[in-house]
């Protein structure tokens, strides 16, 4: 990947853009789940929220996740020495795996809400909504501070 080494900062910039888009979607999607659960008895409202959930997941969250992964892997291929820069990168990658699990669990929640909107209450989704925020904070600290 030496031929791409001159483009590392461009790849990094697009990685940051993709991460911001992915995180925005992961912050908002569970909020839609809250509205869905709170208004399960309002079929018209639920219909609109379901469309929003599907579009957000399919057209924003998933492509942003894919682009985040592609640019992240590309950065590691361009600069494999980053693996030797300390444990912070390994910890960050572990947290990214947790974000991926969260992302796909959101799809599971969408399916569950579609089948039974009363399965989990709005409080569950409010707490669930905090997980990507915590992961993002930890990832940013690891990337910027590189504490180990």
UniProtKB/Swiss-Prot annotation:
Pathway: Porphyrin-containing compound metabolism; protoporphyrin-IX biosynthesis; protoporphyrin-IX from protoporphyrinogen-IX: step 1/1. GO terms for molecular function: metal ion binding; protoporphyrinogen oxidase activity. GO terms for cellular component: plasma membrane. It is an enzyme of class 1 (oxidoreductase). It is found in: Cell membrane. It comes from the Bacteria. InterPro entries: HemJ-like (IPR005265). Binds 1 heme b (iron(II)-protoporphyrin IX) group per subunit. The chain crosses the membrane at residues 7-27, 59-79, 86-106, 128-148. It catalyses: protoporphyrinogen IX + 3 A = protoporphyrin IX + 3 AH2. Coiled coil: none annotated. Keywords: Cell membrane, Heme, Iron, Membrane, Metal-binding, Oxidoreductase, Transmembrane, Transmembrane helix. It is a multi-pass membrane protein. Its cofactor is heme b. The keyword Oxidoreductase applies. NCBIfam families: protoporphyrinogen oxidase HemJ. Homodimer. Belongs to the HemJ family. HAMAP family: HemJ. Catalyzes the oxidation of protoporphyrinogen IX to protoporphyrin IX. Is involved in the biosynthesis of tetrapyrrole molecules like heme. Does not use oxygen or artificial electron acceptors such as menadione or benzoquinone. This is Protoporphyrinogen IX oxidase.
